[in-house]
């Protein structure tokens, strides 16, 4: 790849888009950005400074200070931070600040794989490849439960499922940049698909685009 190449991956929480994004970025040697971590970083900053999540001005300041190169997944992956992130993500001004940072990241050679909720529709509407990765709420809840138990934690399936449904409703129902597939996105339903199968399906889509582009 000699030009900046962008792969946009969108979808609800727990559908497997993060794992898929990492696999694709590694395979095609592209930069990787989990845009959800940028919103989590804003929420984390507010929590660390004991500021209320509805303090829009403080959230805007935190958004401007987010460093894309220093997003600590281990710290930012906490469940409570994810819940808080969904709340600060509804502020249009915060979204605009972070979207500009995300776009700048995508423009950095050799290109990037970005995963989130509005990559193909808002952040990178001209992305070379757009994937919308989804799965049923029940499957996503089971995956989340297994993930928590794999690291020695405990959780309740019913509570996790209810949380996922609430988050879906919030993400899909917000007025600014709602979660939805781009009109030209390739749909990948991973409800009955292992990550390897999803990766191979996505790779086939990317390779097809690259092949046609090289022939043009």
UniProtKB/Swiss-Prot annotation:
Keywords assigned: ATP-binding, Cytoplasm, Kinase, Nucleotide-binding, Transferase
Molecular function terms, GO-annotated: ATP binding; CMP kinase activity; dCMP kinase activity
Location of the protein in the cell: Cytoplasm
SUPFAM superfamilies, sorted: P-loop containing nucleoside triphosphate hydrolases
EC number, as in UniProt: 2.7.4.25
Pfam (any one): Cytidylate_kin
Name of this protein: Cytidylate kinase
NCBIfam families assigned: cmk (TIGR00017)
Catalytic activity: CMP + ATP = CDP + ADP; dCMP + ATP = dCDP + ADP
Enzyme's top EC category: transferase
Family statement: Belongs to the cytidylate kinase family. Type 1 subfamily.
Binding positions (ATP): 11-19
GO cellular component: cytoplasm
Record InterPro entries: Cytidylate_kin, Cytidylate_kinase_dom, P-loop_NTPase
Superkingdom in the source lineage: Bacteria
Gene3D superfamilies: P-loop containing nucleotide triphosphate hydrolases (3.40.50.300)
GO BP of this protein: pyrimidine nucleotide metabolic process
């Amino acid at each position: 790849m000699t030009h900046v190449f962008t792969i946009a991956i969108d979808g609800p929480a727990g559908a497997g888009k993060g794992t898929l994004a990492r696999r694709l970025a590694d395979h095609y040697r592209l930069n990787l950005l989990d845009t959800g971590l940028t919103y989590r970083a804003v929420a984390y900053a507010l929590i660390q400074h004991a500021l209320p999540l509805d303090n829009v001005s403080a959230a805007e300041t935190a958004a401007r200070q987010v460093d894309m190169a220093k997003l600590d997944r281990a710290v930012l992956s906490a469940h409570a931070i994810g819940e808080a992130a969904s709340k600060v993500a509804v502020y249009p001004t915060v979204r605009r600040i972070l979207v500009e940072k995300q776009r700048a990241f995508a423009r950095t050679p050799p290109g990037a794989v970005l995963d989130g909720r509005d990559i193909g529709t808002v952040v990178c509407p001209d992305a070379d490849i757009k994937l919308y990765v989804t799965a049923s709420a029940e499957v996503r809840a089971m995956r989340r439960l297994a993930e928590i138990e794999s690291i020695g934690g405990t959780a309740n399936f019913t509570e996790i499922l209810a949380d996922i449904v609430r988050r879906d409703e919030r993400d899909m129902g917000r007025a600014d940049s709602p979660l939805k597939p781009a009109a030209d996105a390739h749909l990948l339903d991973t409800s009955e698909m292992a990550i390897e199968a999803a990766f191979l399906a996505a790779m086939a889509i990317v390779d097809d685009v690259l092949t046609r582009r090289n022939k043009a």
